[in-house]
């Protein structure tokens, strides 16, 4: 499998190189040159497979030529063997034809475990084969950091440095990062805000000289391997609800468009998906595009669903590439204009093509709390705020009551106690058994000033274990 850039000017790469590259050299994002397509007979034969076996069948074409089948099977078995539920991603019925796909049974209780548990193991495998070692730098406001650290904690060839704003993440989120103790794990609390952390990561990627030749790798949602891993659970859910002989619809809480783009790819690979709903909060750049062909940058508004608090959606470029007939030059020109003006729209026929599959809804904090309370009263299920937004969008935007509607349950409610408390249900979520002692565990974290030079000196000093810098 070869991968090409959405902007058309970077060389095509194989899976190994894409895994390590993150962004393409022309600033674009990598996508498969040719998307595999499965027949209905193939998809039907996967009914009842354990999650890791289904994952092998769905993802095998993407790693072909880079990872041997036996190695990939072993990696997948290890990846999904650490999840706390036997089904890995169980379906929970809310009522009638309405379902929640629980994606929070991984080590850090968020959907990001599906991709980052795999990404860490893939990196370690590829680096061992190459005899290389890399440094991962990332910034987090909570969930991504803990999932990335948990995914890389046993990697022999990776040193990971995650920055979070000092005293600005919840105690649960902080402890999920700082209680993972390993020689290759480095938590840095920056005396600043999340944007300060993000800017330091960007500056480090732009000028990697401080690492003296060691490669810096990104694990955020632009990395193709994360999108690839998320395709699987769309097949997993749909197969339990009658696919491929029956269509299924999905409502997806999304800010960066990565999770829902995986559903779009699943459909293009042969899964009968009749509708994809973009469910978002008041930071609604995706809703404004889907509802009115206006992708305009706006002010950031903090919300009860912080994982969707974004101004620009980093994976939206991958959809634009397809809407423009995979014309990288057209996408590059469009995004250059967006960078200059903060505004983007596409030709009417391209937007109409997107609307054949996509619907969207922006949900306020008040509506989010209403939905948490309503679902709890009617079904006994306690939702996190992101999942509640997905359920609200599913109920308001679904096109057919006869088609199963699946909302992606993106996080465990224990991660967002403020939203649950504001919903007024009088029920506080409890930590799962494997995290019951979280508040007693030893923490390890380094507090650093908001100064790039001091952060880079720390990374240079502690990174690349076992090899001179």
UniProtKB/Swiss-Prot annotation:
Give the EC class as a word. lyase
Please give the InterPro entries that the UniProt record associates with this protein: Ser/Thr_deHydtase_PyrdxlP-BS, Thr_synth_N, Thr_synth_N_sf, Thr_synthase-like, Threonine_Synthase, TrpB-like_PALP, TrpB-like_PALP_sf
Instruction: List each coiled-coil range.
Output: none
Q: Which Gene3D superfamilies does the record cross-reference, listed alphabetically?
A: 3.40.50.1100, Threonine synthase, N-terminal domain
Query: What organism is the protein native to?
Result: Pseudomonas aeruginosa (strain ATCC 15692 / DSM 22644 / CIP 104116 / JCM 14847 / LMG 12228 / 1C / PRS 101 / PAO1)
Q: What is this protein called?
A: Threonine synthase
Query: Catalysed reaction(s)?
Result: O-phospho-L-homoserine + H2O = L-threonine + phosphate
Q: Does the keyword Cell membrane apply?
A: no
Its EC number is: 4.2.3.1
Gene name for this UniProt entry: thrC
N6-(pyridoxal phosphate)lysine (modified residue): where? 112
């Amino acid at each position: 499998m070869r991968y090409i850039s959405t902007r058309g000017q970077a060389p095509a790469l194989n899976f190994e190189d894409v895994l390590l590259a993150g962004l393409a050299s022309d600033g674009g994002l990598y996508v498969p040159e040719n998307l595999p397509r499965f027949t209905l007979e193939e998809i039907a034969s996967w009914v009842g497979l354990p999650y890791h076996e289904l994952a092998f069948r769905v993802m095998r074409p993407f790693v072909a030529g880079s990872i041997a089948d036996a190695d990939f099977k072993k990696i997948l078995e290890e990846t999904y063997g650490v999840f706390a539920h036997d089904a890995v991603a169980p379906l929970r019925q809310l009522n009638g034809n309405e379902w929640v796909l629980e994606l929070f049974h991984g080590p850090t209780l968020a959907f990001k475990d599906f991709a980052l548990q795999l990404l860490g193991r893939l990196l370690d495998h590829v680096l061992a084969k190459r005899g290389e070692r890399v440094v991962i730098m990332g910034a987090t406001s909570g969930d991504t950091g803990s999932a990335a650290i948990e995914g890389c904690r046993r990697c022999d060839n990776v040193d990971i440095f995650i920055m979070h704003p000092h005293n600005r993440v919840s105690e649960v989120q902080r402890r999920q990062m700082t209680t993972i103790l390993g020689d290759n794990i480095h938590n840095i609390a920056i005396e600043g805000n999340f944007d300060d952390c993000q800017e330091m990561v960007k500056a480090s990627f732009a000028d990697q000289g401080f690492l003296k030749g060691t490669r810096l790798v990104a694990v955020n949602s632009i990395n193709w391997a994360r999108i690839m891993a998320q395709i699987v659970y769309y097949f997993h859910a749909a197969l339990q609800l009658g696919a491929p002989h029956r269509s299924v619809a999905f409502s997806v809480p999304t800010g960066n468009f990565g999770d829902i783009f995986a559903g779009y790819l699943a459909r293009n690979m042969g899964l009968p998906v009749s509708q994809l709903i973009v469910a978002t909060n008041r930071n609604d750049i995706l809703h404004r595009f889907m509802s009115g062909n206006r992708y305009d940058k706006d002010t950031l508004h903090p919300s009860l669903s912080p994982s969707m608090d974004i101004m620009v959606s980093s994976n939206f470029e991958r959809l634009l590439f397809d809407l423009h007939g995979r014309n990288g030059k057209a996408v590059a020109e469009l995004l250059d204009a967006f960078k200059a003006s903060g505004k983007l729209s596409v030709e009417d026929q391209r937007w109409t093509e997107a609307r054949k599959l996509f619907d969207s809804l922006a949900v306020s904090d008040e509506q989010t709390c209403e939905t948490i309370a309503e679902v709890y009263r009617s079904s006994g299920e306690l939702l996190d705020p992101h999942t509640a937004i997905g359920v609200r969008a599913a109920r308001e935007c679904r096109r057919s009551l006869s088609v199963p509607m699946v909302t992606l349950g993106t996080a465990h409610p224990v991660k967002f106690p403020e939203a649950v408390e504001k919903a007024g249900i009088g029920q506080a979520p409890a930590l799962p058994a494997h995290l019951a002692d979280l508040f007693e565990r030893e923490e390890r974290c380094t507090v650093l000033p908001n100064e790039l030079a001091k952060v880079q000196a720390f990374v240079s000093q502690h990174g690349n274990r076992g090899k001179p810098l």
